[in-house]
Amino acid sequence: MAVTSLLDTVFRRRKKKSTEFISFFEFDLDTIKAATNDFSELVGRGGFGFVYKGRLQNGQEIAVKILSTSSIRTERQFHNELIILSKLKHKNLINLLGFCTKRDQHGLVYEFMPNSSLDCFILDPHRAAQLNWEMCRNIIDGIARGLRYLHEESGLWVVHRDIKPGNILLDSDLKPKIVGFELARTMQQGENAAETTEIVGTVGYLDPEYIRSGRVSVKSDVYAFGVTILTIISRRKAWSVDGDSLIKYVRRCWNRGEAIDVIHEVMREEEREYSISEILRYIHIALLCVDENAERRPNIDKVLHWFSCFSTPLPDPTFGNRFLVEEETNWPWSPSLSPGHSSVTSPISSR
């Protein structure tokens, strides 16, 4: 293995736009096969490939994502993740150690996260019972700090486009790290939104304005983050197989004055009154994040301020009269067949 420059090895045809790149290893395929015992321990899978656990000769545990298919689209997503992660470093983002390319095989090598993804934790009754509110709050706050870095502090103004519990990994201390940058895109400084040619993301977490207009912005991530908060607190899926959405359920509870019913029963029974008040505040903030009007949504910096300053009053959530956008839109796939577990792509029809 040799330490190699990302642009020199993968993107020779691209002009170098910045000197602030993070160097990492280019692994040869034999090294990856040896580290993963010939890809014997599958620890995850998604719309972009399979993830295997491995161990390098120095003892470091790694996770290796191998693209499931080779196509122009998947290669573009592979290159996109490499280029973006080569410029990013934050304690709440996954640490990319290197990559491997050989013929039609493409792999990314990450640090290994022993507690898997957040969705595996909160949607498993046994593991979810181990999470008290303090742990959940720290996870939520960590995700928000990672998003603030992407949106405001990295200098790239990155929109992730697929924030969800499945793209949040937990380390040994349950500290969250954002992963899944295949669909991410950068914005120009001062750019409020960018036109896209296709809708990408995960059912239940997709920004309604993004779906309607094809324009993506950092507020699209704020929307998905709001759904993620509600998923953590309720331990419910964003989209159930019967076609009901978590957002609709939470709004019904809020309108009836029964927001406490959103809190998972184990947490509701075990937490003290002060903690319950704090959880209800987080539900309130989440509802502001999932406002159907992107302009009314807070930016992530304001969300973090609301988290840390309990005395700051919150505006009332605004619920439109429209049905959720997933019900308004004639999707080429059924949401009930893909309830928040895999990323989906839909072309934007001409308007």
UniProtKB/Swiss-Prot annotation:
GO terms for biological process: defense response; positive regulation of defense response; regulation of abscisic acid-activated signaling pathway. The keyword Nucleotide-binding applies. Its main location: cytoplasm. Disruption phenotype: No visible phenotype under normal growth conditions, but mutant seedlings show increased sensitivity to abscisic acid (ABA) and salt stress during post-germinative growth. Increased susceptibility to P.syringae infection. Weak expression of pathogenesis-related (PR) genes after infection with P.syringae or salicylic acid (SA) treatment. Its EC number is 2.7.11.1. SMART domains: S_TKc. The modification Phosphothreonine is found at T197, T202. Autophosphorylated and phosphorylated by CRK36. PANTHER family: PROMASTIGOTE SURFACE ANTIGEN PROTEIN PSA, RECEPTOR-LIKE SERINE_THREONINE-PROTEIN KINASE. This is Cysteine-rich receptor-like protein kinase 45.
